[in-house]
Amino acid sequence: MMFNVRNTTLTTQKEVREFVDFHLEGLDYELKLTQGSYPYATDTDTKVVKNIDKAIEEITGIKPKHSTAGGTSDARFMAPLGIKVIEFGVKNDTIHSVNERTTKKEVQDLYKVFKYLIKEWK
C-alpha cells in the first residue's frame, strides 16, 4: 500500500511514523517512509511578502491572509534552494471541479499585482 501525506512545517517524518505505528499496533506490517520534498513557510517579514501584501491590498482592496492551507505545488522544490517562495493566484472556490473558472477581473488584478511586484523589486 502506498499513501501520500501532505505535512506542514509543524509535522516531521518521525511524527508520521509514530502516528502510523500507534494506529497499527499489534499488526504485522513493514513501513518504509520516504520524503521527496519538505514543507516550507517563507518568513512573513521578508521583502517579497511585504511587497505582495501591499500590492494585493492596494489593487484589490483585500487584506491578504497568510496561510499554508491548500495543496502542494512545485514551489516546495525551490524553497530548499533559498528562494523566498510565495504563492498567490486567483480565488480557488471552483478549483479542480467541473467548470473550474475565474473572472476576467481576477486575472487582470493578478496581472497588476505581479506587475507591481516587478516594478517595486529593487
Model-derived segments and spans:
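Metal-dependent amide/peptide-bond hydrolase catalytic core
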Residues: 1-122
